[in-house]
Amino acid sequence: MAAARLLPVPAGPQPLSFQAKLTFEDVAVLLSQDEWDRLCPAQRGLYRNVMMETYGNVVSLGLPGSKPDIISQLERGEDPWVLDRKGAKKSQGLWSDYSDNLKYDHTTACTQQDSLSCPWECETKGESQNTDLSPKPLISEQTVILGKTPLGRIDQENNETKQSFCLSPNSVDHREVQVLSQSMPLTPHQAVPSGERPYMCVECGKCFGRSSHLLQHQRIHTGEKPYVCSVCGKAFSQSSVLSKHRRIHTGEKPYECNECGKAFRVSSDLAQHHKIHTGEKPHECLECRKAFTQLSHLIQHQRIHTGERPYVCPLCGKAFNHSTVLRSHQRVHTGEKPHRCNECGKTFSVKRTLLQHQRIHTGEKPYTCSECGKAFSDRSVLIQHHNVHTGEKPYECSECGKTFSHRSTLMNHERIHTEEKPYACYECGKAFVQHSHLIQHQRVHTGEKPYVCGECGHAFSARRSLIQHERIHTGEKPFQCTECGKAFSLKATLIVHLRTHTGEKPYECNSCGKAFSQYSVLIQHQRIHTGEKPYECGECGRAFNQHGHLIQHQKVHRKL
């Protein structure tokens, strides 16, 4: 587009300075509705920026006058075109109101200018003709500067100009008003003085050093998103954000790490990634001294100490300490599972869960414990594992005082006191304290066994069962009794064994008062009172109250 046309600056041999007489109307660039309709969204955005910048600069000179209607329209987010006037006063679009009464001798104007060609590429119509002031394309991406020009004269009685001038960058006095477009960088003498923020948002009172920054900010309040992606239709409030978004479609990743070669779409992501190599963690929690690579991670962490949960689900009222967790939660209500595994077709509501799941297929365990060398497929599991070495249990139950190494474990424990079971099975109605227990239970109905032993091919519905099974092959017995030194492959088995030394029998029968050291033994015992025999022989139909008794009975049929 050609450069934006601004009114020539009227000045004469008056004793008052030009600045004292300059008003916003003298330099405003007004549009008719037809001209406004012809602009694309990007041009409209640039027009808004230039007009607001112009007004801000005029105001900064301390000149009197009320706020023009067009500025009020822009602040309200309305279309800033002016109504066409009737007859000879019909708007010329790009010119302010008083310009309709002026006639410009373009030949004189251009010959007075330092032998430079007119920046608007007007054509000479002859010495006796007035210049054709028909609108040219409105705004360019180059800098537009309004400053002092050679003195012109206006005959106020006849409303005829004796001279007129095209504005030239060479004639600028830098003490005058300067209007700059968004796309050009400010030179030091053009920038707003350091620390000064003259542009204030009328909605929230926030101040900015440039009007273009104010305009971008105001789109938060108006919801305006003029920059639209031509591929997917997604809209953005800033052109720079659209440029970054386009890289999703093009696959462009121009920012490459010098250490490992990993590439990123956005420079800020590369800067954060560099901290992995340098080990830099500049953001430290004042409560517990834990440090983070990103400020956002610190802010999220601090909510553990404050208990703040600012993100509330509008459907169920549940609150979260991070916006991404809220978005993931909302998919519980919508049933949306946008992340699909290419190997088995299983879908997930959270991308992180998909990545964890894919490691089942690849066997990848990228998170290694620095203490014992044990590797894990999930970082959160490694963090929990670290507490085995440190013994740290920072989360305490307010009911019973029991402490836990992880906050989620505390939350699950608290449901023992409240008896809350928020996760119900749609098939049978059985409810569970933990969501993971529901998922595992649902495999009873589906028959799914996604966890397969690499040694013998045996499959399991729960990952924990696979881990326990693998110890049969490895012979690992990580749980040792401190009393007698006996080792066990399962922690639960160690707990039961310890009761041999303590004599503890916490499970008591309500019918006869007999106590047991194991919950499973209590369940078997209670069948004596109820007469329940859930284990039935497929050969003869005989039923038993214990699974072990059924196994023994079936050997009778095999001998026959």
UniProtKB/Swiss-Prot annotation:
GO process annotations (BP): regulation of transcription by RNA polymerase II
Subcellular location: Nucleus
Domain KRAB, first and last residues per copy: 22-93
Position of the Glycyl lysine isopeptide (Lys-Gly) (interchain with G-Cter in SUMO2) cross-link: K125, K136, K148, K162, K225, K421
Paired cysteines (S-S): none
Major localization class: nucleus
Listed GO MF terms: DNA-binding transcription factor activity, RNA polymerase II-specific; identical protein binding; RNA polymerase II cis-regulatory region sequence-specific DNA binding; sequence-specific double-stranded DNA binding; zinc ion binding
A single cellular component GO annotation: nucleus
Record key words, sorted: DNA-binding, Isopeptide bond, Metal-binding, Nucleus, Repeat, Transcription, Transcription regulation, Ubl conjugation, Zinc, Zinc-finger
Keyword Coiled coil: no
Zinc finger (C2H2-type) stretch: 199-221, 227-249, 255-277, 283-305, 311-333, 339-361, 367-389, 395-417, 423-445, 451-473, 479-501, 507-529, 535-557
Record's function text: May be involved in transcriptional regulation.
Family the UniProt entry places it in: Belongs to the krueppel C2H2-type zinc-finger protein family.
Name of this protein: Zinc finger protein 250
Biological source species: Homo sapiens (Human)
